């Protein structure tokens, strides 16, 4: 849990949801203000909630998750923050909304927030060459820190090579450059003009930011992300293997068996070193705080002057991607939504927000065996359902729409399921 000193920013939390933040500074040089959109202080309509709960329960079955935590904030209609399921098959303790968990690739946005903060302070240049700050990567002399943030460095990803080692030796502490080397060893793609999903790029960016600032990555995320938004349960933990907080959601994985996975006996992997993710996917949070961060980041609310625009130059998320699915700034742009999704051992997490209205969806599943697409599809399915919620009395719904339907992503989850729906009891 980050420590809030008297010189850091303080926040007053208004409204029913933790998203309604008004942040004020303590001294002239530290002054900072972020005001979230007004949020209707009531529950979302029952039929909307019922549809969303059915969507989450469906995704839990198909991914082998025993538990989930969800937050949906529709400023003009209401909120839905809930926990479903249990810690594991063996531990039938009910999941609660205050449990903390690993947020996976949402960490990438935090790392980019730090980059832009240091650039705004004149401590680093966005177009600085990577070797200026990271040793042993001389071949990246034409790659900039902004390329690392935007996913345009061309380097590969380490996870496909080392994921098995993470699961077999969760207590191992990895050096970021060692981990990144597995991605650097892959054939690069053309830099600058092509997005490539690369954990190695964000690992290198973390090292560069540490070198530029003289601070650790944990200290940087505390100073530039957690403290400004008063996120007391959000941090990049120390690398020693540990659970993600004092009240953690259990993280699980499924063992591979012939023809698929053993969905009846998830394996606990709650305790692991945060170094497997570091500044790519190592941070932890709670659902309320994840939603708060996602909304503020989408609105570029952590910066006094959002210029240059962090999300101004998106590229297709992959070859032949839909025109509304792009990536830049450590985030994915999905229609009007900005956010991230991904998995890390034990957890699959997604968080997306609309910068104009403040509409926000955040969700975590306590199983990481399915592809990271599953939790993205769930977040988008929930967003499609919630976007149709009627305005509360006295409110006016904005012009807000998504380029997909909830049915589309219900079917997409079905298509990539790693676990079958259990037979109905006779």
Task: Please identify what each model-predicted range represents.
Residues 1-31:
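Secretory targeting and sorting signals
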Residues 50, 54-58, 93, 112-116, ...:
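Solvent-exposed, polar/charged alpha-helical surfaces in well-ordered, non-transmembrane soluble domains
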Residues 63-66, 90-148, 189-198, 278:
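Short active-site loop at a secondary-structure junction
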Residues 26-80, 268-426:
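Catalytic loop of the DD-peptidase/beta-lactamase superfamily, centered on the K-T-G motif
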Residues 86-89, 368-369:
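A short acidic/small-residue loop/turn micro-motif
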Residues 142-337, 341-343:
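Short, surface-exposed loop or secondary-structure junction motifs
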Residues 26, 71-73, 113-120, 200-211:
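Primarily hydrophobic membrane-targeting regions of prokaryotic envelope proteins
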Residues 69-71, 102, 147-149, 196, ...:
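Structural recognition of the beta-strand scaffold that forms the well-ordered cores
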């Amino acid at each position: 849990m980050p420590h809030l000193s008297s010189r850091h920013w303080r926040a007053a939390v208004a409204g029913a949801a933790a998203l309604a933040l008004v942040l004020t500074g303590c001294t002239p040089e530290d002054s900072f203000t972020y005001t979230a959109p007004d949020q209707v202080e009531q529950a979302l309509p029952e039929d909307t909630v019922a549809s969303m709960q059915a969507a989450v329960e469906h995704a839990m079955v198909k991914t082998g998750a025993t538990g989930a935590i969800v937050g949906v904030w529709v400023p003009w209609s209401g909120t839905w923050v809930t926990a479903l399921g249990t810690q594991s098959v063996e531990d039938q303790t009910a999941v609660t909304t205050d449990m903390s968990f690993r947020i996976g690739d949402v960490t990438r946005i935090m790392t980019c927030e730090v980059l832009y903060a240091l650039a705004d302070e004149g401590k680093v240049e966005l177009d600085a060459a990577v070797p200026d700050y990271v040793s042993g990567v001389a071949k990246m002399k034409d790659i900039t820190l902004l390329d690392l943030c935007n996913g345009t460095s061309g380097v590969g990803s380490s996870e496909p090579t080392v994921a098995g080692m993470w699961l077999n030796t969760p207590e191992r502490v990895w050096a970021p450059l060692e981990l990144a080397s597995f991605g650097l060893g892959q054939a690069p793609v053309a830099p600058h003009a092509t997005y490539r999903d690369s954990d190695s790029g964000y690992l290198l960016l973390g090292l560069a930011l540490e070198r530029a600032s003289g601070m650790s990555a944990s200290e940087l995320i505390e100073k530039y992300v957690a403290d400004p938004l008063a996120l007391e349960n959000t941090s990049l933990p120390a690398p020693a293997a540990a659970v993600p907080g004092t009240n953690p959601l259990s993280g699980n994985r499924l063992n591979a068996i012939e023809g698929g996975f053993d969905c009846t006996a998830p394996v606990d992997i709650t305790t692991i070193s945060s170094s497997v993710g570091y500044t790519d996917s190592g941070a932890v949070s709670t659902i309320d705080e994840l939603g708060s961060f996602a909304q503020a980041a989408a609105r570029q609310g952590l910066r006094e002057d959002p210029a240059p625009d962090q999300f101004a130059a998106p590229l297709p998320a992959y070859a032949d991607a839909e025109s509304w699915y792009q990536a830049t700034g450590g985030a994915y742009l999905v229609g009007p939504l900005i956010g991230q999704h991904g998995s890390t051992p034990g957890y699959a997490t997604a968080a997306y927000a609309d910068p104009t209205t403040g509409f926000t969806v955040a969700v975590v599943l306590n199983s990481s065996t399915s592809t990271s697409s599953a939790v993205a599809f769930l977040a988008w399915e929930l967003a499609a359902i919630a976007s149709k919620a009627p305005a509360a009395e006295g409110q006016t719904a904005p012009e807000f729409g998504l380029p997909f339907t909830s049915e589309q992503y219900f079917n997409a989850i079905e298509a990539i399921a790693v676990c079958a729906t259990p037979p109905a009891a006779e």
